[in-house]
Amino acid sequence: DFRIHGYITPLAPQKSLRFYLKEKNLLNQLLDVNHNVDKIILRSSYSGWGNEIFVDGFIATICKNLNVDIMSYHPVITYINGEYWGIHGLRERMDLKAISNKYQIKKKKIIDADDKGYSKKNGYGKLNELLKLLKENPNISYQKVAKKFKMKSLIDWLIVELFFQNTDWPCNNTFFWKKKKISQFI
């Protein structure tokens, strides 16, 4: 099964597509992952479509050894039912199930939060409180932030986004998660 993927890319000339896999280990070797993958994305770049289609994948490849979760990237020429659909980035779909598979944590023991600060699970309110506190108090201590975030991950994430001048950040395509019994988001 598959569907069109994304919030904005459905408006683009080249659509991003999400596929639900029946065989969970079908693409593990190609994606270079050591866990089962149940959803993949053939991703197009809405903002960079036509002139920067490889940038996200290039950055992900450079950053794969940092303290941030990345979606592995492989450019693929896409045909659906014999019709050419363009060049897409083959990526694992990052969601709670992917985190659960990757880190061998039961899905029900994870709290997630998306880039808008929302979560379907209880427990994200404290992160919202911290983000509000950071906005209102620029002199907040490192220790207060470190109680809520895994600092190596947070610092690497900030460096990557700032160094590569991501104009689609921090408001889009960001995903925080943590174990329910641990206070730090990753």
Set out the residue ranges of the language-model regions:
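Conserved NTP-binding catalytic cores of kinases and kinase-like/nucleotidyltransferase enzymes
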Residues: 1-50
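Conserved protein kinase catalytic/activation segment
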Residues: 87, 173-186
